[in-house]
């Protein structure tokens, strides 16, 4: 199995367009080895020829330009991307579909909840159904795509930001709002969980002894943006576990014996983006890697 990290940042990328915090400033100036990052998405292939795109980032075109494996290979129109699978209806997971409207055939797979969100917004009709079939999947049921078995499963999360005002106060929403994926090529298996609000017993059992896990790395600490004075929202309010702390991701994964653990979906304020920071050193000492755009893994 081949995995390419197309984008590694949370919504808005790194640096976000209007962010002038110290973490973003390093990315603007590209000092101290800081890397600019696009919004989180990965591509996965069993054979290196047919690819499944996991989430369609607003930075989709930039990500394709940076990834020769996903360039057109033959004919007048072609893409190695044969399927797109969405793990949520968040803006940074769906907007890239609008850049995939040029009469190219692929299949689009999502929960019924997310497909309903797309259907409610006529702008997504630009993704012509004559070329792009929208196919709902069932949770915990393997889906065969391009030589891979992809199994979507529910994790704690929340409704998309643009749906909060219509949620009636129930920000958690349905069990189809926020999903993880188990991806299996018949030999090796990985898990992709770009958003998760809490570790549950079911998730703990699923990830025990895993070979590879990409996991929500949005914030280092729950009140990170509050302490910086740029927002009143905590990580929990946004539907994300934080990396540090007694209820954080590092602590939750400590007993799970995961061979390779990689943080993805990193907010522009997160100090682990600075490879010279004590937070980055702490994450690495705990056995974690920090994803970057262009990271490739052969599993």
Curated annotation (Swiss-Prot):
May be involved in the transport of PQQ or its precursor to the periplasm. It comes from Xanthomonas axonopodis pv. citri (strain 306). InterPro entries: Metallo-B-lactamas, PQQ_synth_PqqB, RibonucZ/Hydroxyglut_hydro. Keywords: PQQ biosynthesis, Transport. This is Coenzyme PQQ synthesis protein B. GO terms for biological process: pyrroloquinoline quinone biosynthetic process. It comes from the Bacteria. Pathway: Cofactor biosynthesis; pyrroloquinoline quinone biosynthesis. Belongs to the PqqB family. SUPFAM superfamilies: Metallo-hydrolase/oxidoreductase.
């Amino acid at each position: 199995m081949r995995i390419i990290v197309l984008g590694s940042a949370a919504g808005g990328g790194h640096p976000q367009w209007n962010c002038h915090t110290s973490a973003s400033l390093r990315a603007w100036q590209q000092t101290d080895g800081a890397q600019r990052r696009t919004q989180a998405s990965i591509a996965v292939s069993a054979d290196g020829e047919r690819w499944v795109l996991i989430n369609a980032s607003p930075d989709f075109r930039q990500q394709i330009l940076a990834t020769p494996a996903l360039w057109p290979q033959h004919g007048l129109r072609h893409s190695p991307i044969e399927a797109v699978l969405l793990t949520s209806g968040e803006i940074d997971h769906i907007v890239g579909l609008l850049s995939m409207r040029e009469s190219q055939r692929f299949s689009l797979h999502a929960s019924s909840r997310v497909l309903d969100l797309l259907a409610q917004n006529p702008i997504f009709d630009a993704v012509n159904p004559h070329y792009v079939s929208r196919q709902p999947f069932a949770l915990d049921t393997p889906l065969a795509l391009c030589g891979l078995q992809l199994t979507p499963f529910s994790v704690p999360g929340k409704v998309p930001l643009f749906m909060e005002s219509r949620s009636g106060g129930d920000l958690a929403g349905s069990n189809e709002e926020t999903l993880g994926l188990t991806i299996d090529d018949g030999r090796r298996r990985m898990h992709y969980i770009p958003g998760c609000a809490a570790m549950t017993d079911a998730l703990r059992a699923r990830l025990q002894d895993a070979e590879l896990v990409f996991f929500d790395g949005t914030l280092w600490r729950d009140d990170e943006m509050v302490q910086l004075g740029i927002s009143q929202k905590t990580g929990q309010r946004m539907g994300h576990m934080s990396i540090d702390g007694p209820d954080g991701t590092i602590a939750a994964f400590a007993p799970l014996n995961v061979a390779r653990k990689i943080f993805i979906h990193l907010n522009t304020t997160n100090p682990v983006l600075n490879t010279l920071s004590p937070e980055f050193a702490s994450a690495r000492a705990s056995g974690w890697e920090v994803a970057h755009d262009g990271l490739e893994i052969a599993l």
